[in-house]
Amino acid sequence: MYLFGFGSLVNIKSAQNSFKNRELKKEDLIPVKIRGYKRVWNSIESICFEKEIVNGIFLNIQKDENSYIFGVMIKISEEEFEVLKLREKNYSCITIKKESVINQKLDDDLIAFMTTKEDKIAKIGQENCFIPSRYIEIVKEGVKNFSKEFQDNFEDIFSNFPFEIKEGIYTFS
């Protein structure tokens, strides 16, 4: 079974937080190109910035037949999948068909966690919504470790921010 990561999971240090029982190595994060999806800033998570609760906006994916995205796939066990489901409880677990993966021949489909619940999808102009600058840094740091084509695929989301960026340390509330 493979997990597809399209945001902070492209950063090995961040991904390691999801895998407490094994040490991830660089080669565990396999770059993949997937047809039929695009990356968007619209996933709401309640976060705390210096004692202030706000809606943090994080990366999400959505279906788009005319697009493709890069991300990483990580081979996971059934036990790791169960732990991930708990950690990603606000997300829907979706299946990405192995045929959608352009640059790898796979035996299995991939799973991914994406926001699909209406109340967890941010609308442009919605109040009290901020993209944490630290999250942007985490994703950018991870992207640096991959090919130019991989990096270029993230270019658009790093230049068009639909919500205000908020500096500082945050925690999930």
Where are these regions (language model features)?
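A glycine-rich, hydrophobic/aromatic-adjacent loop/helix-cap motif
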Residues: 1-173
